[in-house]
UniProtKB/Swiss-Prot annotation:
Subcellular localization, as worded in the UniProt entry: Cytoplasm
SMART domains: Cpn10
Subunit structure: Heptamer of 7 subunits arranged in a ring. Interacts with the chaperonin GroEL.
One Gene Ontology cellular component: cytoplasm
Pfam families: Cpn10
Protein name in UniProt: Co-chaperonin GroES
GO biological process: chaperone cofactor-dependent protein refolding
GO molecular function: ATP binding; metal ion binding; protein folding chaperone; protein-folding chaperone binding; unfolded protein binding
Organism encoding this protein: Aeromonas salmonicida
Family the UniProt entry places it in: Belongs to the GroES chaperonin family.
Top-level lineage group: Bacteria
Main localization of the protein described in the UniProt heading: cytoplasm
Keywords of this entry: Chaperone, Cytoplasm
Length: 97
């Protein structure tokens, strides 16, 4: 199945962080926090401005990003894996290698 986000929406696959504490102890279950890093799988056409123009998004497919997981972030299943659908404004940074 293919999902195409609309407008300023972005589809992200979460990149799971290793569940270790600062002291090197492996955390289990609820002690491990979900990662807020992911890879952009698809982007919408852009944000519609008040004057009707469309502003292209700053992120592109393949970008590694840090995002804010909060109100408005939707989790969906895509080909058996969880993906996140969120607005570009929920993306805090692009991680450059």
């Amino acid at each position: 199945m293919k999902i195409r986000p609309l407008h300023d929406r972005v589809i992200i696959k979460r990149i799971e962080a290793e569940a270790k504490s600062a002291g090197g102890i492996i955390l289990a279950g609820t002690a491990a926090q979900k990662s807020t890093r992911g890879e952009v799988l698809a982007v919408g056409t852009g944000r519609i401005l008040d004057n009707g123009d469309v502003k292209a998004l700053a992120v592109k497919v393949g970008d590694k990003v840090i995002f804010n997981e909060g109100y408005g972030v939707k989790t969906e299943k895509l080909d058996g894996q969880d993906v996140l659908i969120l607005s570009e404004t929920d993306i805090l940074a692009i991680v450059e290698a």
